[in-house]
């Protein structure tokens, strides 16, 4: 994995705010998002070619709150990948037989083979999140999981599997808005589950469970990467950047595309305490500051214009006065000349 430091100037930082974000809600514009995502898709295809060529194994775990955008992110990342070399794992609840077996058994068979990338739409960390909060596992089962998971991940990494763990976080109000939308949008109703409504009322319980999960399972060899997904488009671009920046594959465009992610969107759990703000609100604040600056500049320009007009009028008045005096002088001299000629004659 690349540890080289980069001086990062992202495309969104080079353009005018209005070209990248919507002034009404601070979220990324579709046009800019699609333009940047296309560049990242090309790099993801290069990554997949490298994975296939060298029989690499990559497992990408997506955990997070309900309606945080896990499925949509996976769909965006794998849109142009060869389906023969990548797949998505989204297991249903355990069967009666699976409940009697070692918890990790049903996940072992889903792990990537050589030359394969596997995306997990929720993973074995279900036990530390939804299963624990909703009471779907006992305290003994939870303790067994939490003491074994780091060792399992260490063994997988030692055997050549690259693991990336992303936790997608979303604000309480935004989560509520998305869940309500699922209830009314026929094209999104399939996403609605029986526990979605309960997750809204159990916000604090989930927060506590996730904090304990991070504290026990965030390791130097397999860290948790947290992502603010209040703006889904911004989140997806920066997840792709983060993933690509951590793998040294062939023909990588590290100077223009594979940049380090925006630290306001993506960060390691160890830096979690510094990221409590909604990035969309920061964009709205910048729009407000720009609007204020534009208004102030217009006011200054108006004053300057009025001053210039006043000075111009004074100049014109002075010029007119000088012209009149000159005309009087010429007339006086002409009269004097005429009188002199008359006298001589």
Residue ranges and their predicted role:
Residues 1-345:
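Glycine-rich phosphate-binding loop of ATP-dependent small-molecule kinases
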